[in-house]
């Protein structure tokens, strides 16, 4: 029996868990931020991800997915902007890793001076930078909404809240994992720089993937 217009509820929850667990730029950014700057800053980044995902899900519900399909040039423009931002973040991490190798003490001092709101803004932009996420949300959610239910908006809202709750649990795990990794990496500066380089390279790869994404 559908509940609040939701069909196959537990199938949806299981699907959300698998989707959230897939490695992506949002989760990697939160992990890297918490490893570099601690729990509080990690949660600021996580809040940026939550807000960004909420905006994308709202846009999906408002029909922006149909607009993107109807206007391919809009989709192309947005995806290239998103890819450029992923490149920017990736190159920044690669440069930071190089600086850390050359002068670990100076890098640590610079990290202390970073604007505390910067991780939130970066994570928010990162979450909003993928127009294909709008298409994903609408195509994923619609499978679990009963077409005969009188209030489909309520069904969509419940599905969105469940996704955000699962995301919050997973990102919390990553934040505390990142803090533990930071303590370990502090004694191994070369390894820390290598890990940062790896994450930066992944972000560049995510940028390439987004730049070559299609509507289909």
Swiss-Prot record:
What is the predominant subcellular site recorded for this chain?
membrane
Q: Where are the transmembrane segments?
A: 12-32, 48-68, 74-94, 134-154, 156-176, 191-211
Mind telling me which Pfam families this protein's record contains? Answer: LysE (PF01810)
For membrane topology, the record states:
Multi-pass membrane protein
Asked if the Swiss-Prot or TrEMBL record annotates the protein with the keyword Thylakoid, the reply is: no
What InterPro entries does the record tag this protein with? Homoserine/Threonine_efflux, LeuE-type
Instruction: Determine the domain of life of the protein's source.
Output: Bacteria
Q: What is the lineage of its organism?
A: Bacteria, Pseudomonadati, Pseudomonadota, Gammaproteobacteria, Pseudomonadales
Report the protein name in the record.
Answer: Uncharacterized membrane protein PA4757
């Amino acid at each position: 029996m559908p509940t609040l217009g939701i069909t196959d509820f537990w199938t949806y929850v299981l699907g959300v868990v698998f989707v959230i667990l897939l490695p992506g730029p949002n989760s990697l950014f939160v992990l890297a931020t918490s490893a570099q700057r601690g729990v509080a800053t990690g949660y600021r980044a996580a809040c940026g991800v939550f807000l960004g995902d909420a905006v994308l899900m709202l846009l999906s519900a408002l029909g922006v997915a149909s607009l993107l399909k109807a206007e391919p040039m809009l989709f192309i423009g947005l995806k290239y902007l998103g890819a450029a931002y992923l490149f920017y973040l990736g190159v920044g991490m690669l440069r930071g890793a190089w600086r850390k190798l050359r002068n670990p003490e100076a890098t640590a001092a610079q990290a202390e001076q970073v604007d505390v709101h910067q991780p939130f803004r970066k994570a928010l932009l990162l979450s909003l930078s993928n127009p294909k996420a709008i298409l994903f949300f609408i195509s994923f959610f619609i499978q679990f909404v009963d077409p005969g239910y009188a209030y489909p908006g309520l069904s969509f809202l419940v599905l969105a809240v469940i996704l955000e709750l699962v995301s919050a649990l997973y990102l919390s795990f990553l934040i505390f994992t990142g803090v533990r990794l930071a303590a370990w990496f502090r004694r191994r500066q070369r390894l820390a720089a290598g890990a940062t380089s790896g994450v930066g390279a992944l972000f560049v790869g995510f940028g390439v993937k987004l730049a070559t994404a299609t509507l289909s």
